[in-house]
Amino acid sequence: MKVFYDSDFKLDALKEKTIAVIGYGSQGRAQSLNMKDSGLNVVVGLRKNGASWENAKADGHNVMTIEEAAEKADIIHILIPDELQAEVYDAQIKPYLKEGKTLSFSHGFNIHYGFIVPPKGVNVVLVAPKSPGKMVRRTYEEGFGVPGLICIEIDATNNAFDIVSAMAKGIGLSRAGVIQTTFKEETETDLFGEQAVLCGGVTELIKAGFETLVEAGYAPEMAYFETCHELKLIVDLIYQKGFKNMWNDVSNTAEYGGLTRRSRIVTADSKAAMKEILKEIQDGRFTKEFVLEKQVNHAHLKAMRRLEGELQIEEVGAKLRKMCGLEKEE
């Protein structure tokens, strides 16, 4: 898989263009500021006088309504939550799409699953930093960047690569390295990673470990330190050095115990469950479920959030994070 760097990309394709960033959350703020600081012409489209309106103005942006931004821009970069994109697109963006314009995303969800169907003659691309927005902005200001992905779903103008690669360069992604992929691959792997490992799998593993120790009579504080707090140390080692060097950096006791016991935790049944989760993503079952959840105003999600906040590990963790100076007293 080819990796592109700064010397491979040029900003030329965007020199006479206007980029409208729709949304001003973590990614919207970071990407719009980085592109603006790279000399690109950026406007920000937001709900009139919404919560982000003044924030974007304070950051020096030319702020306008979503409709005004969509009409003015050559490239419309949609960075609002997945579940809101189709509705906003249909009502406020689609009427202003003309042949030769570019529709851009940082996650392929709505294009891949067909919730947004652009008209003919419009480029459809994706540029996705592989990092939270704050890191995208901080590393750019430090003179570097974070890795990213680019995709081209529709190349109506025969220069979609030049456009999306220029956006990646403007955001600072090519300073670290950019990989070209597809909307399908980006969407399905991203959802799988979130559900099976990064957000779903890890939190359930931590919770099970914490509860096992507490139920065996150990102090909740000790259980938290050993199953949650110290996880960051191990993840940082893996992130920086890989598995092999992580094992080199921990004690022999930890290495032997981990290597000989890990397959009893993540079993063949666990991998079979992962495969089923991936199938649900691939065949659209998860997407249908998520759409139905939105239709009932996220009732199930809100209930799960409430229950998660009531867990003992949350209560113990809040106290220990304050003790460690990680979380300020309210």
Swiss-Prot record:
It catalyses: (2R)-2,3-dihydroxy-3-methylbutanoate + NADP(+) = (2S)-2-acetolactate + NADPH + H(+); (2R,3R)-2,3-dihydroxy-3-methylpentanoate + NADP(+) = (S)-2-ethyl-2-hydroxy-3-oxobutanoate + NADPH + H(+). Pfam families: KARI_C (PF01450), KARI_N (PF07991). Substrate binds at residue 251. GO terms for molecular function: ketol-acid reductoisomerase activity; magnesium ion binding; NADP binding. Gene3D superfamilies: 6.10.240.10, NAD(P)-binding Rossmann-like Domain. Binds 2 magnesium ions per subunit. Pathway: Amino-acid biosynthesis; L-isoleucine biosynthesis; L-isoleucine from 2-oxobutanoate: step 2/4; Amino-acid biosynthesis; L-valine biosynthesis; L-valine from pyruvate: step 2/4. The keyword Magnesium applies. Mg(2+) 2 binds at residues 190, 226, 230. It is an enzyme of class 1 (oxidoreductase). The keyword NADP applies. Residues 1-181 form the KARI N-terminal Rossmann domain. Mg(2+) 1 binds at residues 190, 194. The active site is at 107. Keywords: Amino-acid biosynthesis, Branched-chain amino acid biosynthesis, Magnesium, Metal-binding, NADP, Oxidoreductase. InterPro entries: 6-PGluconate_DH-like_C_sf, KARI, KARI_C, KARI_N, KARI_prok, NAD(P)-bd_dom_sf. GO terms for biological process: isoleucine biosynthetic process; L-valine biosynthetic process. NADP(+) binds at residues 24-27, 47, 52, 82-85, 133. Involved in the biosynthesis of branched-chain amino acids (BCAA). Catalyzes an alkyl-migration followed by a ketol-acid reduction of (S)-2-acetolactate (S2AL) to yield (R)-2,3-dihydroxy-isovalerate. In the isomerase reaction, S2AL is rearranged via a Mg-dependent methyl migration to produce 3-hydroxy-3-methyl-2-ketobutyrate (HMKB). In the reductase reaction, this 2-ketoacid undergoes a metal-dependent reduction by NADPH to yield (R)-2,3-dihydroxy-isovalerate. This is Ketol-acid reductoisomerase (NADP(+)). It comes from Methanococcus maripaludis (strain C7 / ATCC BAA-1331).
